[in-house]
Design a protein with these regions (language model features):
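Aromatic-anchored segments of alpha-helical transmembrane domains
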Residues: 26-33, 181-194, 241-253, 296-303
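Interfacial loop-to-helix transition and helix-capping segments at the boundaries
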Residues: 12-17, 39-51, 141-154, 190-216, ...
Length: 352
């Protein structure tokens, strides 16, 4: 029997997903601010949890977008238009503008092979090949230009996985989703075990890549396919159960009994929150700033640390960084992201 994703029109129009994405982006900002500035910052949501939340929401919304698209080409173009323009902007802008704070003279900077390697590697979403620019942020605690970009290649891989996964979801979605989920959990557990046994950070890096993160994405898809079953028929016991699992994992990170069910529990909490707090949709009226906030926050923090502004005044440094990132995110949305999305939507309506 075929099962199709269900998502009521009322919830589609009024939900808190944009608010949650902004919240998770801010959580990643908080974690990176503390790490880069070597400041102890307390925030209830870690960067890993924020990224996991992003992937869960993506699994839910992007899969829904695929089923609502006119075809594979339409789906791919939508994903490219949403992700690529702002990504290219932040990579190119950092490469050009950060020459102003490089320890190298302009001529040496722009003729250095690392400058071009950075552009090629990062524009190819292979950030790990060249995460630094010549002479930039060399006196910071970490010399990386944008340590947040590693998730974008994972996100794109997950987007590409959706059409392939959809081929197998036509008849036995529960079995297929369950199989992919379990395999991802096994991969995550194996990489964690190997890292703890050997101390080799390669296993930790592999754990954070596509195969380890797909469990969160699939958890979001599960909530989409069984939306009514989970959020309406059985929410009375599923929601408290998910909350208990989430809290246990929060206070006992990495326990082998909790880790396999944590993504599903987190997904239940996220989707339930987004659907039952529809008033938070007011955030969407002003724009979807979460992507820009996520893209720009890391280099902004690094830049202010590099020029040594307010380093001895953490609260002022935080406010300056937050306001700058927020401003860039707003400008990026209104001047670039929204215009591209709106222009292409208009072109699609004009096509016969």
């Amino acid at each position: 029997m075929s099962v199709q994703p269900v998502f009521s029109p009322e919830v589609a129009k009024r939900n808190g997903f944009d608010f949650l994405r902004l919240f998770f982006a801010f959580s990643v900002f908080m974690a990176h601010f503390g790490e880069l500035a070597s400041i102890s910052v307390w925030w209830p949501v870690s960067s890993a949890m924020g990224v996991a939340g992003f992937f869960i929401i993506s699994g839910f919304l992007i899969t829904r977008s695929y089923y609502r698209s006119a075809g594979l080409r339409d789906y791919c173009l939508k994903r490219i238009r949403r992700i690529v323009p702002a990504y290219v902007l932040v990579v190119v802008a950092c490469a050009l503008l950060l020459s102003l704070v490089s320890t190298l003279p302009a001529q040496a900077y722009f003729t250095d092979k690392d400058f071009y390697t950075y552009l090629v590697a990062n524009l190819s979403f292979m950030n790990f090949l060249q995460p630094v620019l010549p002479g930039v942020f060399t006196d910071n605690a970490f010399p990386y230009i944008n340590g947040a970009l590693w998730t974008i290649k994972v996100e794109l891989a997950l987007y590409a996985f959706v059409p392939l996964l959809a081929l197998f979801l036509r008849r036995r979605p529960g079995f297929v989703l369950g199989t992919v989920y379990v395999l991802s959990c096994l991969f995550d557990h194996t990489m964690s075990f190997l890292y703890e046994s050997s101390g080799n950070e390669l296993y930790l890096i592999l754990e954070r890549q596509f195969l380890g993160q797909i469990r969160f994405f699939v958890a979001g898809i599960v909530l989409l396919f069984y939306f009514d079953f989970i959020t309406k028929r059985h929410v009375r016991w599923l929601l408290p159960g998910a909350a208990i699992i989430f809290l246990l994992r929060y206070f006992f990170i990495g326990h082998w009994m909790i880790e396999p069910v944590y993504p599903i529990a987190f997904a239940v909490l996220i989707v339930s929150f987004a659907c039952y707090f529809g008033k938070l949709a007011v955030v969407s009226r002003y724009g979807d700033f979460s992507y820009g906030f996520y893209l720009y926050h890391y280099p902004v923090i690094q830049l202010f640390l590099c020029v040594d502004w307010m380093r001895n005044h953490p609260a002022c440094l935080f406010l300056i960084c937050f306001c700058t990132v927020s401003g860039l995110a707003c400008l990026s949305w209104h001047l670039l992201e929204k215009r591209i999305l709106r222009r292409n939507a208009s072109q699609e309506r004009q096509q016969p």
